[in-house]
């Protein structure tokens, strides 16, 4: 995939996400693609990814906006920095605006996304929503544990400094 093709794919992905067009969003992924979301968990396959957009993202948020900047791609892996914002529809936090930034990682296959993950500071989002500090702490501790348990993190921690397998 060229850099221009990657940028075009990102434009389709963002437009579909903002419009709540779950099928168009899922079509940006391979049939067995995976979307790793730090709030809603992992979604595998176009059907689950479409469900995530229509029945989770747009259930819980309105006026969703997502832009990606400075995309880079080597043909197989792509990255982009993003900004997104929304207004919460979750009853406990209804009407509260949130803006977050993050770094997105895309594994690419046959012109589509085969694996998507992101690094977003969810603590910033929770603070903007007005989540109680003890609840934020509990969530951040869980995310920290999940990071520690990832195979890539374990491999990183087990090898000596300045080495890579």
Where are these regions (language model features)?
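A beta-strand edge to alpha-helix "cap/lid" segment located at domain peripheries
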Residues: 57-165
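Short acidic-hydrophobic sequence patches enriched in Asp/Glu that either
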Residues: 5, 44-48, 98
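A generic structural signal for short
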Residues: 1-2, 41, 91
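Helix N-cap and loop-to-helix transition residues
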Residues: 2, 21, 44-45, 121, ...
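A solvent-exposed, acidic/Ser-Thr-rich amphipathic alpha-helical stretch
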Residues: 22-26, 30-78
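Short, low-complexity N-terminal intrinsically disordered segments enriched in polar/charged residues
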Residues: 1-31, 146-165
């Amino acid at each position: 995939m060229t850099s221009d093709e990657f940028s075009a794919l990102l434009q389709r992905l963002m437009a579909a996400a903002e419009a709540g067009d779950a099928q168009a969003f899922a079509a940006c992924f391979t049939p067995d693609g995976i979307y790793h979301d730090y709030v809603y968990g992992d979604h595998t396959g176009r059907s689950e990814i479409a469900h995530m957009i229509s029945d989770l993202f747009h259930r819980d948020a309105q006026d969703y906006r997502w832009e990606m900047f400075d995309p880079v791609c080597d043909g197989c892996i792509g990255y982009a920095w993003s900004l997104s914002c929304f207004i919460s529809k979750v009853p406990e936090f209804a009407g509260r605006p949130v803006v977050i930034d993050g770094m997105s990682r895309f594994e690419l296959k046959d012109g589509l996304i085969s694996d998507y993950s992101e690094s977003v500071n969810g603590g910033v989002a929770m603070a903007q929503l007005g989540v109680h500090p003890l609840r934020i702490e509990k969530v951040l501790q869980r995310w920290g544990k999940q990071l520690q348990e990832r195979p890539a993190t374990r491999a990183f921690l087990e090898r000596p400094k300045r080495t890579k397998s």
